Structure formats: structure tokens, C-alpha cells
């Protein structure tokens, strides 16, 4: 029975804009990536987690949010060093991101710096947009949604963390699409018409180009699902 591969994804950064500005001439950078794999909307136990040396200083106001300092990141690999491992992990998956525009903007900027293809060929689902459709007049931050659904968020009480946030978001996402259903597979969708922890384990260049993994019937069912919940088609099959 075929199941959709989804990657719940989050980043932490040194600031709000990866592009150079008058007040920030070198742009902000990604300093942490967390990702959790789902199959059929159920966590597989596979994760990607990596702290990243931003090759610039971390502002104090950013440290107050995620708790990461220049010293914490000084011995970590650069994004270019871990880019291939990251791309391998997310390959073939639909990206599930809260406020996707922010994370995709940063990741695409980092990938460009690393001379890699950006994420424009990936489908993605923005859980913030899903939440705003479901709760149009309410607060829809990750904290607010976790509280609304009774999901434990004590792990992010002091600081935000990419892997902590993806674990919370994976549970929030399942609630937003109708609750955790282990048998919610591609076959079900057709009928209804609707850890690898890689920290400090980067390998450099990918040995061969990534290949398409979905069959034609899986692609159609996957497309139906994306449409049914208001996801955005970006994946070039």
C-alpha cells in the first residue's frame, strides 16, 4: 500500500532576512535545520537534525529566541558541507512547514550559495495557511495551535529549536488535516477523492543525481491530496 512521504521541516536563523540590506550588508543565515519524516502522515522515526556554522555573527536578539551563540556554532559544519545530506533526506517528500515563505526563502538562499538547485520543484503545505482557513479569527502561531490541540510544548518553553518545533508541528499538522490516522494512505485518498540523525555526519558531494521515486498512480493520488487540503503545487514530476 503506497503512502505519501512528507517532511515536516523547520529552521532557526540569525535573523529575519537572508538578503543583504543597508543595515545588514551580509544577510542572515540558517543556523539549525530540523526535519521529521512521515509516511501516510505517521512519523517513521527518521529525522534530520543539524546545527550550522553561519559564517557570520549571531545577534544577541536572535540568541534570546533560540539560545544558540557564536561559540555554540563555531565548530559546526557550514551549510555547503551538509547541503547534500539535507537534500537526500527530503528527496521525494512533500514539505510541511509553518509559515513556509520564511523557511523556503532562507533555504533557497543557502542552496544558491552552495551552488545547489533550490526547492522550487517541491510541493509544500503551509500549516499556517491551513490553520488560518480552519481558524480564521484566532491566533495561529505554533504555540497557540499546540495549546488548542492539547499538544505538549514544554520542550520549547525556554527556547525555540528546529527539531523540537518539527516534532510539535508534525502533531499539529495531523490535527489540522483531521487527526492522526495510521491507515491514511494514498490508496485511501484515491478512494475518497480527496532518525536518520545526520548531525556531524555530512558527506560532501552527492554521488549521483536524485531520481523520481513515485509511480504514476501515486503521483495522481498525491496531487489529489495536495489539492484537497489547499497545499501548493511546486513539485516538477
Feature roles, as predicted:
Residues 83, 139-142, 219-222:
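Alpha-helix initiation and N-capping motif
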Residues 94-97, 106, 110-111, 141-201:
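Acidic, Mg2+-coordinating catalytic module of metal-dependent nucleases/exonucleases
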Residues 136, 160-163, 216:
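Short, well-ordered coil↔helix boundary/capping segments
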Residues 1, 175-237:
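Acidic two-metal-ion nuclease catalytic site recognized across multiple nuclease folds
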Residues 1-122, 132-135, 144-159:
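Conserved non-catalytic scaffold segment of RNase H-like nuclease domains
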